[in-house]
């Protein structure tokens, strides 16, 4: 037996010694010193005292649950047996004295309430019997009185009420007295009540209430055992509105007929019928403009709420936070000018690279974006094409730029694309720095350039204007430093600012479809910082930036303001000029992209339908145009747009070009099938066909051509259209003879003696006989003689005799005109 002292016990139970001694004294132990020994029995006594003082008692189990499991076998068809296991569980609860006392009180209250209810019921029954007795006596007195012959006997209340009373009386006799229900009955009723649908509590009514004839006819019927039952009426009813329902109809910039009808809660046929009455035939999927839809909705009596179609985009713009300190950024400079004036060569010298030699035909066909570190700071350059077909590219270049370098060749002067570049720069409000190139040539004439540009309102600084003119030579490298100095001086004047800490924003310069990497977009970051992994929204496309490359193809992690980069990860190739912005989450980007796609589709459908309606009467009675169908594939989006724009301008009233399919990337099997189905020519601009496409082209004999210079495509298409035009029949007047006398011949009839006054008269050629310059006969020259000899031709100033086949009414003074018909090839 282990013995411990009071001190050791206090240490074990983590209690002060004085407190433990006090508790031991309260337990009836005689310990008063910390060194005294405590036995096990004394410990048990102390523990029992502490438990009783704290209220802990050894509780007996209050709930016992019994489970029973029985297994049986069920035989089914096909001599199969199924084992069925039935489990039952029963729980017995031992209630405390307090609960038993409360239960007794509830039973007593229930008995008192039941006795009170019985008393009220007895009083009500006695009262009812007294009323019935009074009614019976009144009915008997009425029946004994003499009734008029015309009035029929009453058959409602006495006839119906008396038998019912008898039946109820018999029921009362047989009905046993109600006993107080046991706990088991109440529990069972509560269990059933959980599974029964809740019914409305009916108001207390007298047991035998007389029914009227209306009640009998309206849903009441007699049951088989004399019980009154009510028919269930589960019929659904619709109550028409008291007045017309006025709805709020939200109308955007465009809305289809079906959507408008749905918002007004009417059938689309009613809207179409109304539009027909207004004189506008429409279909269910036709797009209406905002004014027309507003007029229709107001005519139907609804309230119109005009909403902006750009609400979703405005919310997106508001959600983006562009906070941070604005800092100076590098200028974006666009090099513009006429073709072959040396734009790319000038940029090459600045970049110390040879780009122009790599361009097909020596002309730029894409917008190139580069940033260059100079001694005076960083400058971003955009190189635009100068050919007329690249008008849209130059316009985009001017839109994204801060300063324009206008390159003009000193030996060539101001050309059409030079004028166009000036117009784009002025429309964008961008300052112009003129670089007079090719100053190393002996025929250079810079004064001619100044005069030509002054006529376009580009006044040199030395003439009091604001456009610096810098003579340069891209070949020799002279004047390049002065040109960069002039550009950076203009940039300082503009005070260009950007916020590097904000989310990235920019513009798409170019896009293409790379076979290994998917859609690739060249983006110029204009504000903020674009980072790898950002979710970007670009026009109708979106995606997460998987990788970013600089202009040399090296991967980078982020790009600040004025930096051009190539981004990978978009779901499609965006159009050049589309705005790029970094958004917070993919869901918002997808919503806006899908909204823009739907909006673009609706506008396109509306434009196409309007064009059809406008041209429907113009095309009536005209022959169908001959169409040259083309499937066009290009390497980048900008070149594709330039080609489509150039080809669409070719043609006239008889022939036209239709680009049935276009895209970025190589020629695929689906492109070849499209060309086969539409009888089109396949053109590839800087792209090639894959094996599947080549197989279809060879087997079906399709016309497929590759090009790398835009001039060649345009020239070939012009030739093809010229061949489709056919040829014109033109009449050439060979000679004219004047009739001086008329002779009679037994063989030819009337023979005209003539003098050739113009050209040469030939035999067996068609002729016209003119009298007072009016054609009176057209036929063939049958006989031509000079001095009684048949000749083949008679020249100017000679006399001859002319016999006209099947015509004898020749008179003196008539003119005989000899002509020929020639087929001449037509041109556009």
Swiss-Prot record:
The keyword Cytoplasm applies. Residues 337-344 are annotated as: G1. Residues 362-366 are annotated as: G2. Gene3D superfamilies: P-loop containing nucleotide triphosphate hydrolases, Putative DNA-binding domain, N-terminal subdomain of bacterial translation initiation factor IF2, Translation factors, Translation initiation factor IF- 2, domain 3. Residues 328-501 form the tr-type G domain. Keywords: Cytoplasm, GTP-binding, Initiation factor, Nucleotide-binding, Protein biosynthesis. GO terms for molecular function: GTP binding; GTPase activity; translation initiation factor activity. It is found in: Cytoplasm. One of its GO terms (cellular component) is cytosol. Residues 93-240 are annotated as: Disordered. Transmembrane segments: none annotated. GTP binds at residues 337-344, 383-387, 437-440. Residues 383-386 are annotated as: G3. Residues 95-136, 166-188, 212-221 have a biased composition (Basic and acidic residues). The keyword Flavoprotein does not apply. Residues 473-475 are annotated as: G5. Residues 222-235 have a biased composition (Basic residues). InterPro entries: DNA-bd_dom_put_sf, EF-G-like_DII, IF2_assoc_dom_bac, IF2_II, IF2_N, P-loop_NTPase, Small_GTP-bd, T_Tr_GTP-bd_dom. Residues 437-440 are annotated as: G4. Residues 137-165 have a biased composition (Low complexity). One of the essential components for the initiation of protein synthesis. Protects formylmethionyl-tRNA from spontaneous hydrolysis and promotes its binding to the 30S ribosomal subunits. Also involved in the hydrolysis of GTP during the formation of the 70S ribosomal complex. Belongs to the TRAFAC class translation factor GTPase superfamily. Classic translation factor GTPase family. IF-2 subfamily. NCBIfam families: IF-2, small_GTP. This is Translation initiation factor IF-2. It comes from Ectopseudomonas mendocina (strain ymp). The gene is infB.
């Amino acid at each position: 037996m282990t013995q411990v002292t009071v001190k050791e016990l206090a240490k074990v139970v983590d209690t002060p010694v004085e407190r433990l001694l006090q508790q031991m004294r309260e337990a009836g132990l005689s310990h008063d010193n910390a060194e005294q020994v405590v036995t096990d029995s004394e410990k048990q006594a102390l523990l029992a005292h502490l438990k009783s003082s704290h209220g802990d008692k050894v509780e007996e189990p209050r709930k016992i649950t019994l489970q029973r499991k029985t297994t049986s076998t069920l035989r089914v068809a096909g001599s199969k047996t199924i084992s069925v296991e039935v489990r039952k569980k029963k729980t017995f609860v031992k209630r405390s004295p307090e609960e038993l006392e409360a239960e007794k009180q509830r039973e007593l209250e229930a008995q008192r309430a039941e006795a009170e209810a019985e008393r009220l019921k007895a009083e009500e029954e006695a009262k009812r019997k007294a009323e019935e007795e009074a009614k019976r006596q009144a009915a008997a007195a009425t029946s004994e009185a003499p009734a008029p012959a015309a009035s029929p006997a009453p058959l409602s209340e006495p006839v119906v009420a008396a038998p019912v009373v008898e039946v109820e009386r018999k029921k009362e006799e047989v009905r046993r007295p109600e006993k107080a229900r046991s706990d088991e009955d109440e529990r069972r009723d509560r269990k059933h009540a959980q599974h029964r649908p809740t019914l409305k509590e009916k108001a207390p009514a007298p047991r035998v209430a007389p029914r009227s004839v209306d009640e009998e006819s309206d849903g009441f019927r007699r049951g088989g055992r004399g019980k009154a039952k009510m028919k269930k009426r589960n019929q659904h009813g619709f109550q028409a509105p008291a007045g017309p329902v006025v709805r709020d109809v939200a109308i955007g910039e465009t809305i289809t007929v079906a959507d408008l009808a749905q918002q007004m809660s009417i059938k689309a046929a009613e809207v179409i019928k109304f539009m027909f009455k207004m004189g506008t035939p429409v279909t269910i999927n036709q797009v209406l403009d905002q004014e027309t839809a507003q007029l229709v909705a107001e005519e139907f009596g609804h309230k119109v709420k005009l909403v902006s179609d750009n609400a979703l985009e405005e919310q997106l713009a508001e959600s983006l936070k562009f906070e941070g300190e604005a800092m100076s950024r590098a200028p974006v400079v666009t090099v513009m000018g006429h073709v072959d004036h040396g734009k790319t060569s000038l940029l090459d010298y600045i970049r110390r690279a040879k780009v122009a030699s790599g361009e097909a035909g020596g002309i730029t066909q894409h917008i190139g974006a580069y940033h260059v570190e100079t001694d005076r700071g960083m400058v971003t350059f955009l190189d635009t094409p100068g050919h007329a077909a690249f008008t849209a590219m130059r316009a985009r270049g001017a839109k994204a730029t801060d300063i324009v370098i206008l390159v003009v060749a000193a030996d060539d002067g101001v050309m059409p694309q030079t004028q166009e570049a000036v117009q784009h720069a002025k429309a964008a409000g961008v300052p112009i720095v003129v670089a007079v190139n090719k100053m190393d040539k002996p025929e250079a004439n810079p004064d001619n350039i100044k005069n030509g540009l002054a006529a376009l309102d580009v006044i040199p600084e030395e003439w009091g204007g604001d456009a610096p003119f810098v003579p340069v030579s891209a070949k020799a490298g002279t004047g390049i430093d002065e040109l960069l100095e002039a550009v950076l001086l203009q940039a300082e004047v503009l005070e260009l600012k950007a916020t590097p800490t904000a989310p990235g924003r920019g513009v798409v310069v170019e896009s293409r479809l790379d076979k290994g990497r998917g859609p690739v977009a060249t983006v110029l970051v204009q504000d903020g910082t674009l980072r790898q992994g950002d979710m970007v929204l670009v026009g109708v496309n979106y995606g997460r930036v998987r990788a970013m490359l600089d202009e040399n193809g090296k991967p980078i992690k982020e790009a600040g303001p004025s930096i051009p980069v190539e981004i990978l990860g978009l779901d499609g190739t965006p159009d050049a000029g589309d705005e790029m912005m970094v958004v917070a989450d993919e869901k918002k980007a997808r919503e806006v992209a899908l909204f823009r796609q739907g909006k673009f589709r609706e506008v396109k459908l509306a434009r196409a339908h309007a064009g059809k309606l406008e041209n429907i009467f113009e095309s009536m009675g005209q022959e169908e145009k001959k169409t040259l169908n083309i499937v066009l594939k290009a390497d980048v989006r900008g070149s594709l747009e330039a080609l489509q724009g150039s080809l669409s301008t070719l043609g006239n009233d008889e022939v036209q070009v239709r680009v049935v399919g276009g895209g970025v990337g190589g020629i695929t099997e689906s492109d070849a099938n499209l060309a086969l189905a539409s009888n089109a020519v396949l053109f590839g601009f800087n792209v090639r066909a894959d094996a599947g496409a080549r197989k279809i082209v060879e087997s079906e004999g399709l016309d497929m051509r590759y090009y790398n210079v835009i001039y060649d495509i345009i020239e070939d298409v012009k030739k093809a259209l010229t061949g489709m035009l056919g040829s014109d029949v033109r009449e050439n007047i060979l000679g004219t003879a004047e009739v001086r006398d008329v002779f009679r011949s037994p063989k030819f009839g009337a023979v005209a003696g003539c003098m050739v006054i113009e050209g040469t008269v030939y035999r067996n050629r068609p002729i016209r006989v003119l009298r007072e310059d009016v054609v009176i006969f057209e036929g063939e020259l049958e006989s031509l003689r000079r001095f009684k000899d048949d000749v083949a031709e008679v020249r100017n100033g000679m006399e001859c005799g002319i016999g006209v086949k099947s015509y004898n009414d020749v008179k003196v003074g008539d003119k005989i005109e000899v002509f020929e018909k020639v087929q001449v090839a037509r041109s556009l």
